[in-house]
Curated annotation (Swiss-Prot):
It holds the Pfam family PALP. One of its GO terms (biological process) is isoleucine biosynthetic process. Its EC number is 4.3.1.18. GO terms for molecular function: D-serine ammonia-lyase activity; hydro-lyase activity; pyridoxal phosphate binding. It comes from Serratia proteamaculans (strain 568). This is D-serine dehydratase. The keyword Lipid metabolism does not apply.
């Protein structure tokens, strides 16, 4: 971008200057509207999410057979919700502001198979593709017991097909592990930010890892090119995939059931705020869509990004979406939050969800590490840095009394509020790597 173009953009959107200066910002979205008004722009609806849920139910016997760690939950890939009372007290002190509602954590960080939120969308898209191939070949009926897929016959069949994906780490882990287990030949194109241990875990699972010196966008593009020249290769497109998006969206109805079972109320008098770390946008976008379908206008979804990679905030705030990258403004896209190291947001997610997202904020790597250390010491929960991005959210919301008033949210409603931080990854981080994170955290607190 030319200097004059940047100056023009800053003049039109002063917040962009704050992003360029890498200052942590909070922005509430003036275009946010009701579910009824915003839903038509998504291009998907509750029936699509129900279809995804049914597909996952069909695959539960397969997952149970192929991944023993899912057996206790009968082949359902789901995570628990836990309260964080000690962390809430610690952050009240850290931010000098008392949070009126209750702080909860959604532990997608500890999802089975791949230990991140990507176990939702990534695994779902591979299963949907496998089902399509097996149905077309006449090897499978929708009424079959899908446990039959866990067999030499099906591994041989899927072995004739290839899957490719570009990833900063966690999506590649999910897609690589499930694809290889089914029998596919799978290549994961990894950006420079990807952690070494994630690459090694993939190799240990029989996955072909292709490494790049460049960022996420280049890895995705190369994966796309590989698939384009090979009719038997299926490219999973993190930037544009509706199937991935729907895999994530299933989380909404499941959370509603979890809340019903544990007595967490969500209605006009008991608002729900959900804080989602955002990279390219597919995971948080899909989850937010599912949450809006499940809780309607009583849920407020807020995206969190690193100060060095604020791609979705930039795209939605300016309305340019994937027409602008943080690098165009001289922002380097270098962050320890490897899952969030994305310079250009998904245009599909930005345009689909811009009317259903309440707000966005950024935070520094140093803050993520400090929060990582605090969560470990106060709650004995260990996450990777990017999974902490949602943690300051409740205090950012509480601090903006003007926005709360504009939403018609009063003191009593905020006392009744539930603040859910979506922990996106960290359950499979090796001990040595976690020790490094915690050492960094001690310096950051």
């Amino acid at each position: 971008m030319e200097k004059t173009q940047i100056q023009q953009l800053v003049k039109q959107f002063p917040l962009v200057q704050e992003l360029i200066e890498l200052n942590p910002v909070t922005w509430f979205n003036p275009r946010a509207t009701t579910l009824q008004a915003g839903l038509p722009f998504v291009g998907l609806d509750a029936a699509d999410v129900a279809d995804a849920e049914q597909r996952l139910a069909r695959f539960a016997p397969y997952l149970s057979a192929a991944f023993p760690e899912t057996r206790a939950a009968n082949g359902v890939i789901e995570s628990e919700v836990v309260a964080l009372p000690a962390m809430q007290t610690a952050l009240d002190q850290r931010y000098g502001l008392s949070l009126a509602g209750r702080l909860l954590l959604k532990k997608d960080s500890h999802l089975p198979i791949s230990g991140s939120i990507k176990a939702r969308g990534g695994i779902y898209e591979v299963l949907a593709h496998a089902e399509k191939l097996a149905l077309a070949a006449g090897l499978l009926q929708l009424t079959d017991d899908y446990a039959k897929l866990f067999s030499a016959e099906f591994r041989e069949f899927f072995g004739g097909y290839r899957i490719a994906v570009g990833s900063t780490g966690n999506l590649g882990m999910s897609i690589g592990i499930i694809s290889a287990r089914l029998g596919f030949s799978v290549s994961v194109h990894m950006s420079a930010d990807a952690r070494e241990w994630k690459k090694q875990k993939l190799r240990d699972n029989g996955v072909n890892v292709v490494e790049y010196e460049q960022d996420y966008g280049v890895a995705v593009e190369q994966g796309r090119l590989q698939a384009a020249s090979d009719p038997r290769c299926f490219f999973i497109d993190d930037e544009n995939s509706q199937t991935l998006f729907l895999g994530y969206a299933v989380a909404g109805g499941r959370l509603r059931r979890q809340f019903a079972e544990s007595g967490v109320q969500v209605d006009a008098q008991h608002p729900l705020f959900v804080y989602l770390p955002c990279g390219v946008g597919g995971g948080p976008g899909g989850v937010a869509f599912g949450l809006k379908l499940a809780f309607g206008d009583h849920v407020h979804c807020i995206f969190a990004e690193p100060t060095h990679s604020p791609c979705m905030l930039l795209g939605v705030h300016t309305g340019l979406h994937d027409g602008i990258a943080v690098q165009d403004l001289g922002i380097d896209n270098q962050t320890a939050a490897d899952g969030l190291a994305v310079g250009r947001a998904s245009g599909f997610v930005g345009r689909a969800m811009e009317r259903l997202l309440s707000g966005f904020y950024t935070l520094s790597d140093r803050e993520m590490f400090a929060l990582l250390g605090l969560l470990d010491s106060h709650e004995h929960i260990q996450l990777e840095p990017s999974a902490l991005a949602g943690m300051p959210g409740p205090w950012r919301v509480t601090a903006d009394t003007e926005w709360l008033a504009a939403q018609g949210l009063n003191e009593q409603q905020m006392k009744n509020a539930t603040h859910l931080v979506w922990a996106t990854g960290g359950g499979m981080v090796p001990e040595a790597e976690m020790a490094k994170y915690l050492a960094n955290a001690r310096q950051s607190i």
